[in-house]
Amino acid sequence: MNTAKFRYIICKSFGHNTLDIKYNEGNRIITHFNMCIIDTDNNTFITLYNPNAGEITVKVEDIIELVPHKA
């Protein structure tokens, strides 16, 4: 996992772009699409939101994939 790359994407996307995210949650891999970053804690944790998934908080080191959403 490339946390430096993810932190860069988070910094560039905060308040501007929607993202697709795939991350580890225990023994499961979770995927959400078209998420907006609404908060970050010095890029250690990020909070994302979309109307379908609601609000989620993810530890940056648990992120597997973080890419700009493509319509």
Please name every model-derived segment:
Residues 29-36:
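Structural detector for short beta-strands of small beta-barrel domains
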Residues 36-38, 58-69:
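Structured surface patches comprising rigid loops and adjacent beta-strands/short helices at the edges
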Residues 5-6, 56-60:
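Generic short amphipathic/hydrophobic targeting helices enriched at N-termini
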Residues 1-27, 67-71:
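Short glycine-rich, low-complexity segments
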Residues 45-50:
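SH3/SH3-like beta-barrel fold
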Residues 27-28, 52-54:
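Short acidic/polar mixed-charge low-complexity motifs
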